[in-house]
Every structure is written in structure tokens, then in C-alpha cells.
Amino acid sequence: MKRKEDHLVTVNPEILGGTPVFTGTRVPIKFFFDYIETGETLDEFLFNFPTVKKDQAFQLLEFAKELIIQQIPDENVA
């Protein structure tokens, strides 16, 4: 069974040496988080990387959120 992230992220040694990229692009996932981390907006990222669709960026954020929530033990939740 395919996981949701399998349609979102591609890791292929033939594409940027296996760097995780948005599926259907050559845009590394790391670039997205670097943009957000430096205070750039989602729209600025999408403008500079037009092969990434807005829906892909939102799905990546949702996936990252789910991973973080899964990693936090229940006893640490206030």
C-alpha cells in the first residue's frame, strides 16, 4: 500500500542524487523549509519555484505536522 507521502515526495538517485524533491519536480523539499525559516512567504516560494503547486506545499506542511504530532509522547502534552 502506498503511503500519502509517496505521492508528495520523490527520492530517486537519478534526480539530484537522491535528494528528496516535490514529486514531479526537481525542487528539493529542503528549499521549501529554508524559505519558510527565513521568513519568506508561501507565495514567494511558489513564485520562485513554479513547478511546485500550492496544494503540494500545503500537503507537505500537513505531513510535517502529522509527523511531529506522532513523535510527541502523550505525557508531554499539556
Residue ranges and their predicted role:
Residues 28-78:
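Long, charge-rich, low-complexity alpha-helical segments
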Residues 3-43:
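A short, structured beta-strand/loop element
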